[in-house]
From Swiss-Prot:
Renumbered residue ranges of the record's region Disordered: 25-74, 90-128, 204-252
Gene3D superfamilies assigned: Classic Zinc Finger
Name the UniProt record assigns to this protein: Krueppel-like factor 16
Localization (cell): Nucleus
Residue ranges, compositional bias (Pro residues): 55-65, 240-252
Annotated signal sequence range: none
UniProt record similarity statement: Belongs to the Sp1 C2H2-type zinc-finger protein family.
Swiss-Prot/TrEMBL keywords: DNA-binding, Metal-binding, Nucleus, Phosphoprotein, Repeat, Transcription, Transcription regulation, Zinc, Zinc-finger
CC terms in the record's Gene Ontology section: chromatin; nucleus
Species of provenance: Homo sapiens
Chain positions found as Phosphothreonine: T152
Family matches, as InterPro entries: Znf_C2H2_sf (IPR036236), Znf_C2H2_type (IPR013087)
Predominant location: nucleus
Length: 252
């Protein structure tokens, strides 16, 4: 019995190796324990040998056909092919099921909810003024905070110059005011020798020159590049003369 089972195992292994390598093998291997050559032995011959007299166990079922049919020789090959397909995980492993490639491609391309090629939405002004009848909105919360002071009247930036109690809502306004105490004139006219404490005063003065051109004020040194100095001037008419420098505090 063990010799017959071993012979069937060797035959199945031969078929698997033949299918995987693409060759056709028509001979069998000798069985172990001196079983002798097994050339031309098929599955039915092995079953008849296993059911020889004197072997305990139920008799084997009768064959389906008296003679070898056209598909009898191909039956072991089909069985081996199905086993090999199961081992390889091919399409025969799960008939009727979706292949792993199709399922993975379907899972890797979910609907994004946006039309292909659509550009992302631009940044919106999400910081809106909460005061009624004010529809202003800003990109940054710091800009909104500065705007809210126009409603509340808050002026947290106070001048620390001795004898000056002025306060401002913005730090750049305080810096510009501080130059009125120090007498600093950072903005020089590119067409003459005059200097000014504010960039808008320089612009008004420079326009009076016959050869004035706006590009002259964009040169380095002609006007400051600080954004705080680009605010519109609240004074009308010709620029007022700069005040004389105040005496420095006694503690300095």
């Amino acid at each position: 019995m063990s010799a017959a089972v071993a012979c069937v195992d060797y035959f199945a292994a031969d078929v698997l190796m033949a299918i995987s390598s693409g060759a056709v093998v028509h001979r069998g291997r000798p069985g172990p324990e001196g079983a002798g050559p097994a050339a031309g032995l098929d599955v039915r011959a092995a079953r008849r040998e296993a059911a020889s007299p004197g072997t305990p166990g139920p008799p084997p079922p009768p064959p389906a056909a008296s003679g070898p049919g056209p598909g009898a020789a191909a039956a072991p090959h089909l069985l081996a092919a199905s086993i090999l397909a199961d081992l390889r995980g091919g399409p025969g492993a799960a008939p009727g099921g979706a292949s792993p490639a199709s399922s993975s491609s379907a899972a890797s391309s979910p609907s994004s909810g946006r039309a292909p090629g659509a550009a992302p939405s631009a940044a919106a002004k999400s910081h809106r003024c909460p005061f009624p009848d004010c529809a202003k909105a800003y990109y940054k919360s710091s800009h909104l905070k500065s705007h809210l002071r126009t409603h509340t009247g808050e002026r947290p930036f106070a001048c620390d110059w001795q004898g000056c109690d002025k306060k401002f809502a913005r730090s750049d306004e305080l810096a510009r005011h501080h130059r009125t105490h120090t007498g600093e004139k950072r903005f020089s006219c590119p067409l003459c020798s005059k200097r000014f404490t504010r960039s808008d005063h320089l612009a008004k003065h420079a326009r009076r020159h016959p050869g004035f051109h706006p590009d002259l004020l964009r040169r380095p040194g002609a006007r400051s590049t600080s954004p705080s100095d680009s605010l519109p001037c609240s004074l009308a008419g010709s620029p007022a003369p700069s005040p004389a420098p105040s005496p420095a505090p006694a503690g300095l």
